[in-house]
Curated annotation (Swiss-Prot):
Gene3D superfamilies: 3.40.50.10890, Ribonuclease Z/Hydroxyacylglutathione hydrolase-like
SUPFAM superfamilies to which the protein is assigned, alphabetical: Metallo-hydrolase/oxidoreductase (SSF56281)
Gene Ontology terms: cellular component: mRNA cleavage and polyadenylation specificity factor complex; ribonucleoprotein complex
Source species: Bos taurus (Bovine)
Protein name from the UniProt record: Cleavage and polyadenylation specificity factor subunit 3
GO biological process, one term: mRNA 3'-end processing
Amino acid sequence: MSAIPAEESDQLLIRPLGAGQEVGRSCIILEFKGRKIMLDCGIHPGLEGMDALPYIDLIDPAEIDLLLISHFHLDHCGALPWFLQKTSFKGRTFMTHATKAIYRWLLSDYVKVSNISADDMLYTETDLEESMDKIETINFHEVKEVAGIKFWCYHAGHVLGAAMFMIEIAGVKLLYTGDFSRQEDRHLMAAEIPNIKPDILIIESTYGTHIHEKREEREARFCNTVHDIVNRGGRGLIPVFALGRAQELLLILDEYWQNHPELHDIPIYYASSLAKKCMAVYQTYVNAMNDKIRKQININNPFVFKHISNLKSMDHFDDIGPSVVMASPGMMQSGLSRELFESWCTDKRNGVIIAGYCVEGTLAKHIMSEPEEITTMSGQKLPLKMSVDYISFSAHTDYQQTSEFIRALKPPHVILVHGEQNEMARLKAALIREYEDNDEVHIEVHNPRNTEAVTLNFRGEKLAKVMGFLADKKPEQGQRVSGILVKRNFNYHILSPCDLSNYTDLAMSTVKQTQAIPYTGPFNLLYYQLQKLTGDVEELEIQEKPALKVFKNITVIQEPGMVVLEWLANPSNDMYADTVTTVILEVQSNPKIRKGAVQKVSKKLEMHVYSKRLEIMLQDIFGEDCVSVKDGSILSVTVDGKTANINLETRTVECEEGSEDDESLREMVELAAQRLYEALTPVH
């Protein structure tokens, strides 16, 4: 049994190459109807070089039609320059405008602060720059189509420009949330709930079954912790990524400092080589933020801070007395946040506040277990005496938000990604419990490991739209409509051949077939043999040469020493032409047919003889009173009030008005007339 072509298969396949039972290197492959889509292309923050990549070697990048990036965090877009510049990928790449603007600077910073050799670097600043030309942008709610894949995006909250993508292939809809948050904060709106129900939901599970504390409580705890650190004369370190949660925390701190004059002498630094560029981007894209920010921008730009200074590097930092420094990167693997941590960790007055999610294998995750000492980047051991607090401002959904989101959409299939193995397992169990007694909603929950595929079957109805000339008249029940079936991507249309050029790139062509066959016998012998075969033979003259029209579509022309067949090529005409050819070859090659040939002596039968005999014959069949002659060339037969008229010249029979439905009378009279004509035709 031959394999079903990918385009016709009902199998939909989802395979995580990253973020399968882990957080980091998000990269999900979707395959359906011969199309392949990559959702995100990130790196693992806890790994380096090629080890940080998703399992790209399991796919052929050249087969990917479309790549969609949900937001600018490294674990979602960090491998993109490598994928665009160092692989055979030739598809199209999309992200939102804000994501593209920030991606450029965030990855530039990643290249600069990565603490690995040039040989191990995945890509250079040049690769990053060149990748920008290959990235296209999409507006929220704007519908685009690539290779028959329709897609559009919704606000996801989480960070500026973050998007959830709705993808539609052959009528099957899939929603990929990326990272999302259903809670509005100081500058971002909550993730939207799409008004279209997806068949499949690929959703993050970062926090599993945890419930976040209330925003007000969390902000108060954060501000109080910072206040306590500077009150005791310490330095407060808040490791963050240059963009994202950093802007939320800056808004909180700036407002808190404004309301506490006693803190005005204590500096707050935003320490990132990207500080200025990042803030310029945030000041540009206020329209992608929530209503509160959009209203405030008319009075003043909330991202022009009064109590916060930018700090480009340690060279510009005067480390005297208490201060608060927000430094990147967020997991302290390298860069400014790592330098400051190593120089401050031995003083118990100092404190570090981990404000976001931390991946396994990073320093930030390690110090949350409060070890007695840490290892510096140079390999030295240092005692850890500074306070360590974890106050999560990570804009990911908690169980309550995730559960409500799923309840609103009711997708038949939920695929969990972007979550540590145990958290994901707990979330899966909780979701299954939630719906196990619900007879109305049936939801299957999947949590695939990296490289493990989830296979689903979607058998959609194939509907064909009738368009153009064929659609001009409303069809009646039972009417047969025939045309050309045109498939474009996953849409079917039935068109008249004359409409092909209007609705498609196709043009209607006709092929005229001409075939010459050697023939030396009498031409009227051919007429006789073909008449015996079909009865549908018409005698013609074409350019003063004898000719026959057989089956209404095949022309046979007599030429010296041969006959020429002409017809318009199509399956039925080709079959008729083969039949006529067989008769000609048989007559030409079989002497017996020629010897016993019965030739027509007269092309025309005496009309008055035929008329009289036919009248007698029909009177015998139907009765004397039923048959009458009209104006010499037409005989009428009337039976039970139904009348059929015979044209003696053409031997065609037509029923009079009111008798049209009596097909059996017409056929009987026509058959009698034809048989009598053939019997009376003079032969010798």
